[in-house]
Amino acid sequence: MVSLQFLGTGGARWVVAKQIRSSAGFWIRADGTNLHIDPGPGALVRALAQLPPCDPATLDAIVLSHKHLDHAGDVNVMIEAMCQGGWRPRGALCAPRDALDESMQPVVFPYARRFVPREWIVGADESPFEVGSVTITASPRLRHPVETYGLHFRAGGATVSYIPCTRYFDGIVDDYRARAPAVLVINVLRYRDSMDVDHLTYDDARRLIEGIRPGAAIMSHFGTRMLERDPKRLAYELEDATGIKTFAAYDGWTYDVV
């Protein structure tokens, strides 16, 4: 059994600052293995507020796609919770080098890093990383101001692929299509790119879904303009346009992959 639980589906400064949507990231559960992806601000509180609670002490890995605040704000407290205050070192930490290296303004505190016995530097090691029943691989570096990598989680005979924050470029389609994802999670921050920033838009999401052809697509990490236009309605429109089952994630939603 593989499932995704979205603790938070908000992105961008205003949505995060006002917590219009939570910025807590999402969990992957796969045959007894638990991973927390991009634990932004509020991740610990949101995890424990779920019914039933998502217990950080059951986590096998914490994974960062990149070090920006809305993706990594709660990484240290989640490490402490996973390792029970450091008294029970366990699990794995997966993050780009600039999120960890003390010479590169890291977001993971050195003392918290010592609690975790296994570490995978995303983007530096091209070999797959095994965490329980899950195999994690990374895509080549995406186009964002800090080190950012797409991630692929293989478990139960299915692949969950994640496109975090990036500017659109054609290489994304080729790389992700080769992974044949059962589910594609896309961070769709903006409706239109009126500010020329390194984030995906609604139109980019359509191009990605049409090109990659996943089994299903899930939009998340919404900014204010996406929320104003009703992500659920936009997901229906994308499904009609692409022929691919498309969902707009919401806080607390669980999706069963297999």
Locate the predicted segments by residue.
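Short amphipathic alpha-helix with an adjacent loop that forms part of the alpha/beta core around
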Residues: 48-54, 128-132, 173-178
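Metallo-beta-lactamase
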Residues: 88-148, 155-156, 249-252
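Cap/insert and terminal regions of metallo-dependent hydrolase folds
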Residues: 168-254
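Active-site metal-binding motif and surrounding structural segment of the metallo-beta-lactamase
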Residues: 42-92, 180-183
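Active-site neighborhood of phospho(di)ester-bond hydrolases with catalytic His/Asp-centered motifs
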Residues: 36-40, 59-70, 161-166, 184-188, ...
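Glycine/Thr-rich phosphate-binding loops of Rossmann-like dinucleotide-binding domains
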Residues: 14, 45, 72, 103, ...
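Conserved beta-strand hairpin/beta-sheet module of binuclear metal-dependent hydrolase folds
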Residues: 2-51, 148-165, 183
